[in-house]
Curated annotation (Swiss-Prot):
Name listed for the protein in its UniProt record: Phosphoenolpyruvate carboxylase
Function per UniProt: Forms oxaloacetate, a four-carbon dicarboxylic acid source for the tricarboxylic acid cycle.
The family this protein is said to belong to: Belongs to the PEPCase type 1 family.
Active site: 138, 546
Gene Ontology molecular function terms on file: magnesium ion binding; phosphoenolpyruvate carboxylase activity
Classification via SUPFAM superfamilies: Phosphoenolpyruvate/pyruvate domain
Entry annotated with the keyword Ribosomal protein: no
Gene, per the UniProt record: ppc
PANTHER family: PHOSPHOENOLPYRUVATE CARBOXYLASE
Amino acid sequence: MNEQYSALRSNVSMLGKVLGETIKDALGEHILDRVETIRKLSKSSRAGNEANRQELLTTLQNLSNDELLPVARAFSQFLNLANTAEQYHSISPKGEAASNPEVIARTLRKLKNQPDLNDATIKKAVESLSLELVLTAHPTEITRRTLIHKMGEINNCLKQLDNTDIADYERHQVMRRLRQLIAQSWHTDEIRKQRPSPVDEAKWGFAVVENSLWQGVPNYLRELNEQLEENLGYKLPVDFVPVRFTSWMGGDRDGNPNVTADITRHVLLLSRWKATDLFLKDIHVLVSELSMVDATPELLALVGEEGASEPYRYLMKKLRARLMATQSWLEARLKGEKLPKPDGLLTQNEQLWEPLYACYQSLQACGMGIIANGELLDTLRRVKCFGVPLVRIDIRQESTRHTEALGEITRYLGIGDYESWSEADKQAFLIRELNSKRPLLPRNWEPSNDTREVLETCKVIAEAPKGSIAAYVISMAKTPSDVLAVHLLLKEAGIGFAMPVAPLFETLDDLNNADDVMTQLLNIDWYRGLIQGKQMVMIGYSDSAKDAGVMAASWAQYQAQDALIKTCEKAGIELTLFHGRGGSIGRGGAPAHAALLSQPPGSLKGGLRVTEQGEMIRFKYGLPEVTVSSLSLYTSAILEANLLPPPEPKDSWRHIMDELSVISCETYRGYVRENKDFVPYFRSATPEQELGKLPLGSRPAKRRPTGGVESLRAIPWIFAWTQNRLMLPAWLGAGTALQKVVEDGKQSELEAMCRDWPFFSTRLGMLEMVFSKADLWLADYYDQRLVAKTLWPLGKELRDLLEEDIKVVLAIANDSHLMADLPWIAESIQLRNVYTDPLNVLQAELLYRSRLTEEQGKSPDPRVEQALMVTIAGVAAGMRNTG
């Protein structure tokens, strides 16, 4: 670890030095001196020097409005560079071992050493691997795409500099390129001027595919194949690709009026266009490479006399022509032109697969396996992973929108008001209509705009090429009728196949009722016939934690999954659990390996489907090497969870979790819902109101424009508390509950749970991570600078609670200090703190100046507003997550 960390520190220091030179060139020595003074004071403050801490506060408070932005940008950009270096070191030879693809080899060796597992069982588990990653446009990716691209280039420079054989003149060239990139970043505005549209967000997703996943996925499969061959003597079949990508960008309309049916239609076309573009590049390479003459009779028959001299090239050129014709047609459609479909339009993956696989088989049969297993194999695997759609799209809509649409229809037909019917009456009506052969929608009927939008969305699904829409997710699902309603609306749109419809259970009550809802659905004969033995259910992490606090929410999530697994197993249904996790702890985020092994036994039998959100997409899939690492971690965790499932918790442990859940929920809600001072305190102690000015995502921060904390989305709720370093949503209630159980004489039982139950140990580990990022003196400083004195007691109470929570968690985990088991992460947080602290202090000062200007009725100072936005972005970089 020391060697790894010293290499990271060395690179961070080098990048910081280059940034300093850039600042000096751009703004002069005096600004660099000011930044250096602040950095040294921050470092000394972190080491416990109280006098230097006070001097740091005074220095930052006394900055002139002209100095605010350069200082904020200096520390913010440094943190982005530190994150780039850290990402590189997680995949470099000197980097963290646990992030290396070697993790698969270690898992396979561990499995082979189990007396009750043989190679055939492990092979079967590999063959049933299924991983679907759902990229979402949650507005937590605060870094602009142009800067992300430059960071990727900086990463390449670090890789070249790491080469011990690099010649001096080459090193000089790389350093010059590094200086150019850092100067480009400095002279680029890090804050977007406008909110991205849903189409912009979709394009960002396609850029991730092009720049990283396109190469990362075949590389991961080569690595997996190599490890399987070495450890099991087993080769992956050519058509076996266990990973798929889906996107919510352009499909998630829950609370986002900007995502319309037309937008979804446009994004589907755009996605197909991007797929043709990427496959064309692959085929250009194959046309160049596959110049061989020898071919099987089958391939020669396929190409005929015309292609006999260069059969492989001939087939590739024909495929290239089809791709070009398809791309031209898609371009015309995107421009709004109505053109007839050309002959050979590519709409299905088989059209791509067949000519490529014919070449592969012929090369293998003619003794040219080494060529077949080169670029051609990579392209075949891309066809299986990405295919014609590139990424499939999920449609997500809130349950009440479907209820309102059906209410409007039934009122128009004069058969009553669907919205006011009982659940039993709704189900009876829906099942009757689902079995009916006549249409429900009246002709020449003019629905309201909202209802038209719901119906148009269903029409888009019906028109889309089969396989381009992955699932229909119903947010805030509460009852069986919520699921049946969507099936009816899809039937009315003319969808002739069983579209996967996934209810999303996301509040505490809904999670507790999830099993009952699914049991009722599975008891309906029509429904059982429709789903053909497969069911997807989405578990909401963000909103349940916001509703009840992390401890109660995580236990409700565990119990809901456990009950659903057992119900579906009993009914002979293959269940896919879809995890709606965020990147932050308060939204269910946890290291992938730990998170998966902490789920109930059997939860991964139907594969893993999980959201990858916002800034986590960049951290986990921003580079091809990082993609290989992340997919390897998921693979090893799924194999381990399925072959060495965690133990069923003892009844006594379940009872303790029930107790912890009740106490933590009461404590959490006691503050968040019932304390009259809480909302005013939240609004003043955090930049919650100012976050709305940041042009992050296309989705509004609130589900409804008015209302308090309950109407705020989970992301800005977490984002705000992360900024002031209290991190409140990620721990409030948990420590109080643990302390109460300890006082009841159950500490030894809690220690046993921590040792022997992955679910509980992961919860404590996540709390330790949060505590490491929280900071009492900074949270206190926000109060002193921004909060009315009448609210100070509440702030002190919360900070005292946090301090007590840290003590009780350390006692149960038997740790002397936080993150004792993860020194790399602990060191990383400490490294960034020196640069994040000044941004926090500066942010509090800027919030004070901005709010004072507003109170005085003056126009906002653009220098203050811009610097404030930069501190928000900088703190997000320092915390490594936003919402």
